[in-house]
Amino acid sequence: MLDIKKIRADFDGVAAKLATRGVEKEKLEKLHDLDIKRRELIVKSEALKAERNSVSDEISQVKRAKGDASAQIAAMQKVSAEIKAIDAELAEIEENLNEIIIMLPNLPHESTPIGADEDDNVEVRRVGQTPTFNFEPKAHWDLGEDLGILDWERGGKVTGSRFLFYKGAGARLERALYNFMLDEHGKEGYTEMITPYMVNQESMFGTGQYPKFKEDTFELKDDRGFVLIPTAEVPLTNYYRGEILDGAELPIKFTAMSPSFRSEAGSAGRDTRGLIRLHQFHKVEMVKFAKPDQSYDELEKMTANAENILQKLGLAYRVVALSTGDMGFSAAKTYDLEVWIPAQNTYREISSCSNCEDFQARRAQIRYRDEEGKVQLLHTLNGSGLAVGRTVAAILENYQNEDGSITVPEVLRPYMGGLEVIK
């Protein structure tokens, strides 16, 4: 959530930055007008309350002197009625103001490329060599079905589209990957967590998924309204919701593997086959809590942590800085890691690493106490390290052999009982 004081102090600057994120200036002008009216009413209400207190003192003095206080009582009743009316108007204005501000995206960092969509993203670097084949590489869904390790047909029968069963070596490969990822992040100082897989709506608000992206989630239809997590970012970030941390302990780093549940609203017709876009998938998440002056260094380190996984798996990838028009709602700056998918002859997203600055911390009220004892908002960061199903897809396609078998990357073999080839 944006700081209303910042909008107030630099309206034109904030409006210009938000325009690059598709926010119309009229919406901000409405917010600005409501804020002015709100402050005027607060001043008026406080003046009337001071007047009421003064009249109350007069009534007490008159009564102590056994005099007639009816005039003062009538005056106080009139003032009280005015205060009640102003406070009611103020409550309505604050509700309208809040409805606007909670739907505004984060301000982009100055280094974030300005653009309308993914076509304006900027490639930062490419790492690794894309493989060459002396045969036509198959898509991962065909490889998985032919090997009997991925079963979409029965996943569809049991649940519906965009669901599948991992079977045998497929299930072992998935498990090997997320155990490998967690171990690697543990070496980098991340504390491993197992989170709840359902959260309350306050948690969804804290990280910015609610209310704007409610249609993208699966929500329990009862009086509790719990939500199946779309990413472990939600429970991990909300772990410290409403708390004040010791600045000496920052940065704090968490990692967790969890299922992620997404309705994929608006994705009809996109990636209808394979592991790229599912309603349920495993993901290893990284979350950091950092001091504001250290958060961008921590973003680079987090991105390097995600890259480390791809490098050790021997997968070619590229790093892309997302444009203002393609970046997530809560992010100020985002790097996407895109892995090479041979059958599609392109790079596909496998990780997003973002610095949300104090945007989520303000929504979730996560603060820290600095060396001087001052309490202030910290910065939150999150990143995929990595999306496990997409990593399975990348391994199947990049490590495929002409006979349809899959060579297991060396770093995963200890996690798979020494298995070298899936066939």
Curated annotation (Swiss-Prot):
One GO term describing the cellular component: cytoplasm
Segments traversing the membrane: none
Pfam families assigned to the protein according to its UniProt record, in alphabetical order: Seryl_tRNA_N, tRNA-synt_2b
Pathway(s) the chain acts in: Aminoacyl-tRNA biosynthesis; selenocysteinyl-tRNA(Sec) biosynthesis; L-seryl-tRNA(Sec) from L-serine and tRNA(Sec): step 1/1
Catalytic reaction(s) noted: tRNA(Ser) + L-serine + ATP = L-seryl-tRNA(Ser) + AMP + diphosphate + H(+); tRNA(Sec) + L-serine + ATP = L-seryl-tRNA(Sec) + AMP + diphosphate + H(+)
GO MF annotations in UniProt: ATP binding; catalytic activity, acting on a protein; serine-tRNA ligase activity; transferase activity
A Gene Ontology BP annotation from the UniProt entry: seryl-tRNA aminoacylation
Keywords assigned: Aminoacyl-tRNA synthetase, ATP-binding, Cytoplasm, Ligase, Nucleotide-binding, Protein biosynthesis
Subcellular location: Cytoplasm
EC number of the protein: 6.1.1.11
Gene3D superfamilies for this protein: Bira Bifunctional Protein, Domain 2 (3.30.930.10), Serine-tRNA synthetase, tRNA binding domain (1.10.287.40)
PROSITE patterns from the UniProt entry: AA_TRNA_LIGASE_II
Main enzyme class: ligase
Binding site for ATP: R262, S263, E264, E349, I350, S351, S352
Binding locations of L-serine: T231, A232, E233, E285, S384
Classification via CDD domains: SerRS_core
Domain notes: Consists of two distinct domains, a catalytic core and a N-terminal extension that is involved in tRNA binding.
Record-stated family: Belongs to the class-II aminoacyl-tRNA synthetase family. Type-1 seryl-tRNA synthetase subfamily.
Quaternary structure annotation from Swiss-Prot or TrEMBL: Homodimer. The tRNA molecule binds across the dimer.
General function of this protein: Catalyzes the attachment of serine to tRNA(Ser). Is also able to aminoacylate tRNA(Sec) with serine, to form the misacylated tRNA L-seryl-tRNA(Sec), which will be further converted into selenocysteinyl-tRNA(Sec).
Protein name from the UniProt record: Serine--tRNA ligase
Gene it is expressed from: serS
